[in-house]
Amino acid sequence: MRLILLGAPGAGKGTQAQFICEKFAIPQISTGDMLRAAVKARTELGVAAKKIMDAGGLVSDDIIIGLVKDRLTQPDCSKGYLFDGFPRTIPQAQVMKDAGVPIDYVLEIDVPFDAIIDRMGGRRVHLASGRTYHIKFNPPKVEGKDDITGDPLIQRDDDKEETVRKRLQVYDDQTRPLVEYYSSWAAQANPADKVKAPTYRKVSGTSSVEDITASIFAALK
């Protein structure tokens, strides 16, 4: 099972990625983790990436794909792998395709933006303990107070509506077009392609965690 997981920030990808990886006994591939490991191990690609990052630049797609190809040779990828957060853009998807990285499924968890803003904007946190509440779905016993200590709860900057809207706009501009990219590739599959076009599946991410998981497993049969 080799798949790419798509979905806007706050769509619940992280939760579902864990369930998918457990069911199919595959690793979750994170480009951030790969970069940190390569830099720490001082591999050729890691050294090249560190130079760029130290200069404040963005690591090129070619370096990322090099890291991906190295990662996929590891034994834990023998049954497949899950990409979450990569590719983010059509150029990255094209580089993956050109490099011959095989993908069986592209799975999108679809949640309307208004629901995501509601979901993320309602989060409140007790910083000292990490306890998390939601003003609508999991409210504290006393409004604005931690249940255990009575300390005030805060809203993280990342959860403020303005920040959430900006992140969703970036997703809409850069990543959502991947849905069309993969759908078109499947529809116009070319025998000359290095790798077979993946199957695109979309599931709704607005029901319970258990129902979403069941929908995902049904879609990946």
Swiss-Prot record:
Keywords assigned by UniProt, alphabetized: ATP-binding, Cytoplasm, Kinase, Nucleotide biosynthesis, Nucleotide-binding, Transferase
Protein's UniProt keywords contain Cytoplasm: yes
Enzymatic class: transferase
MF (Gene Ontology): adenylate kinase activity; ATP binding
The keyword Hydrolase belongs to this UniProt entry's keyword annotation: no
GO biological process: AMP salvage
Catalytic activity: AMP + ATP = 2 ADP
Binding positions (AMP): T31, R36, G57, L58, V59, G85, F86, P87, R88, Q92, R156, R167
PROSITE patterns, alphabetized: ADENYLATE_KINASE (PS00113)
Pathway assignment: Purine metabolism; AMP biosynthesis via salvage pathway; AMP from ADP: step 1/1
Chain positions covered by the region annotation LID: 122-159
Protein location: Cytoplasm
Span list, region NMP: 30-59
Domain notes: Consists of three domains, a large central CORE domain and two small peripheral domains, NMPbind and LID, which undergo movements during catalysis. The LID domain closes over the site of phosphoryl transfer upon ATP binding. Assembling and dissambling the active center during each catalytic cycle provides an effective means to prevent ATP hydrolysis.
Assembly: Monomer.
UniProt function note: Catalyzes the reversible transfer of the terminal phosphate group between ATP and AMP. Plays an important role in cellular energy homeostasis and in adenine nucleotide metabolism.
Protein name: Adenylate kinase
